[in-house]
Amino acid sequence: LSLSAQQKEAPKFTLEGRLTKAVFYHDNGEIAQIGYFKNKKRHGNWISYYRTGKKSATGLYRSGLKTGQWFFWKENNLIEVIYKDNKIVNVLEWNNSEKKMIAVNE
């Protein structure tokens, strides 16, 4: 059974130590994102999912800014994006066993 628009699942927030864990849902009831907030800003590891339940992205926030390695899954490709203070530093893409650099921003 799927959820109708009127039965859409509301986000869930739970306190875990000094962080607030957040779970957001797609309109079909599947998890859309799981992550943490600190001082009302995204902080720590975040994971995003497609409506099918398959992982679409994972990465790290520090005080609301994307930082470090992020991975994005699209069809048969894995895209790695390196962030520093919410700015893209480097992008790599893998297609099966082939790796190629897409962009470097230094």
What is the predicted function of each stretch?
Residues 2-106:
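Glycine/tyrosine- and acidic-biased, solvent-exposed loop/turn segments at the edges of beta-strands
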